């Protein structure tokens, strides 16, 4: 391996027993610390030491078969469904079979390309407001939490595009803190279930965690009620499209509780996963500022008065490659647990009924067989001329097949917009003496908040005025 390559933070691999004891003692629920070194090299292997230990599949063809699940043999595990139930109920994130198909069929039209182009105007408005806030930090020189800033920004984007309303900073902070508490609790349940207990373990959450879930659902319910209590046609957003959706067989819409489940998972998954990805993007830019010049060279010609048009998001191959490489190294959803409903064999591996099966974008996307310099940050691998040579099925940050994330296109456009806005305007600096380690809970975030300062970009590096285009407002 080239010694000059940049290797972003990753947990050290420890022997299984030591890693388990350490994780349970720390109580932070970091599943990445349980991965043995061989998990980045084997095709199929076990996590844990018991007969019922979790089976990890790293072979793309096996991953595809499990995720497509044409025979209905690998539903989402009760471990995951039970842990998430207090927050997202029976949303399509946890359902399977006919119920999932009904939900997906009703929801898909809300994320059509047409609606994405319409939503882009709201994305721009939210981003502009948060650029102003970050600019104030640059003026004062005060450090801020990168994680919290990205969570607030992406939550505001989701609120404006899904519900047509900005998100108050105090609500964003409360949701961030409550969700952090919730995902730490879920990760602890996952560790016990994956390593020590059968896959069908009963899931119990503490009163504190249940109260956090109730507060989050209260905020989402209030947003849903605002739409339900107005004249049809007042809003032209994702929430209104989902509210108006009808079951093709019964002609019935979603109930209020179903709307809170479905729109709640849009809000939570839609902003937390993107916030996770962008936190790593700007962490890496602070670590490797030479990339700022390269990205600015591509972004600047498409900026107009500090804005980026919707069409321009399709013309940023290097910026897109940078984002994709950050997603490869830090996939927002680190692990996807399934359970075998019956005895089954997958590519030579026999699984007993009840076996917990794990698909891990984290290990698949860092696997030594499919990636050159797998732990190194090399965005060039995702440039159009190189991407065609990548192993098919080894890159799944948004899932694949019928369960491909419904908001994948939304997240990519949003991220390119935010990257372009901030990269074109600011320089980034990490506060010294921070130990940044990724933690896998529900999303892949730094174990502790990352503190950062920003400075205004020097005017000499501003966009060439003769290359400026206008923002598309569609």
Features from the language model and the residues they span:
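Cytochrome P450 catalytic-core helices
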Residues: 273-292, 296-298, 409-424
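Conserved cytochrome P450 K-helix E-x-x-R motif and the immediately C-terminal K′/meander segment
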Residues: 22-42, 218, 222, 306-347
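Cytochrome P450 heme-thiolate monooxygenase catalytic core
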Residues: 1-11, 76-81, 115-276, 294
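N-terminal membrane-proximal hinge/A-helix region immediately C-terminal to the signal-anchor transmembrane segment
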Residues: 1-102, 122-129, 204, 212, ...
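Cytochrome P450 I-helix active-site segment
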Residues: 10-14, 120-124, 175-181, 232-240, ...
């Amino acid at each position: 391996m080239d010694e000059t390559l940049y290797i972003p933070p990753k947990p050290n691999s420890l022997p299984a027993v030591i890693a388990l004891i350490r994780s349970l003692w720390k109580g932070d629920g970091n599943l990445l610390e349980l991965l043995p070194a061989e998990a980045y090299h084997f095709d199929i292997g076990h996590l844990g030491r018991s007969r019922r230990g979790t089976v990890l599949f790293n072979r793309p063809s096996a991953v595809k078969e499990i995720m497509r699940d044409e025979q209905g043999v690998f539903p989402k595990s009760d471990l995951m469904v039970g842990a998430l139930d207090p927050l997202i109920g029976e949303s399509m994130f946890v359902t399977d079979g006919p119920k999932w198909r009904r939900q997906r069929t009703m929801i898909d039209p809300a994320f059509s390309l047409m609606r994405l182009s319409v939503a882009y105007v709201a994305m721009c408005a939210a981003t502009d407001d948060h650029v102003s806030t970050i600019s104030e930090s640059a003026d004062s020189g005060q450090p801020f939490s990168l994680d919290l800033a990205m969570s607030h920004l992406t939550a505001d984007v989701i609120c404006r595009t899904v519900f047509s309303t900005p998100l108050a900073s105090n609500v964003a902070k409360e949701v961030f803190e409550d969700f952090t508490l919730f995902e730490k609790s879920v990760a602890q349940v996952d560790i016990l279930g994956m390593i020590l207990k059968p896959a069908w373990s009963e899931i119990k959450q503490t009163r504190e965690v249940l109260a956090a879930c109730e507060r989050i659902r209260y905020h989402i319910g209030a947003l849903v009620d605002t739409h339900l209590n107005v004249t049809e046609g007042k809003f032209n957003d994702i929430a209104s499209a989902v509210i108006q959706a009808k079951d093709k067989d019964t002609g019935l819409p979603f109930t209020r509780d179903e709307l809170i489940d479905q729109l709640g998972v849009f809000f939570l998954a839609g902003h937390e996963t993107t916030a996770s990805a962008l936190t790593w993007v700007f962490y890496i830019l602070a670590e490797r500022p030479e990339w700022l010049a390269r990205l600015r060279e591509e972004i600047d010609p498409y900026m107009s008065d500090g804005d980026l048009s919707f069409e321009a998001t399709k013309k940023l191959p290097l910026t897109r490659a940078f984002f994709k490489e950050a997603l490869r190294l830090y996939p927002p959803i680190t692990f996807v647990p399934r359970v075998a409903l019956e005895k089954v064999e997958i590519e030579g591996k026999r699984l007993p009924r009840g076996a917990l099966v794990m698909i891990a974008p984290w290990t698949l996307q860092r696997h030594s067989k499919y990636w050159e310099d797998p732990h190194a940050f090399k965005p060039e691998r995702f440039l159009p001329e190189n991407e065609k040579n990548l192993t098919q099925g080894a890159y799944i940050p948004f899932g694949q097949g019928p369960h491909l994330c419904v908001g994948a296109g939304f997240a990519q456009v949003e991220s390119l917009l935010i990257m372009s806005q901030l990269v074109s305007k600011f320089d980034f600096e990490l506060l010294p003496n921070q130990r940044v380690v990724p933690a896998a809970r529900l999303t892949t975030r730094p174990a502790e908040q990352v503190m950062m300062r920003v400075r205004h970009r020097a005017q000499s590096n501003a966009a060439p005025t003769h290359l400026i285009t206008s923002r598309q407002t569609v």
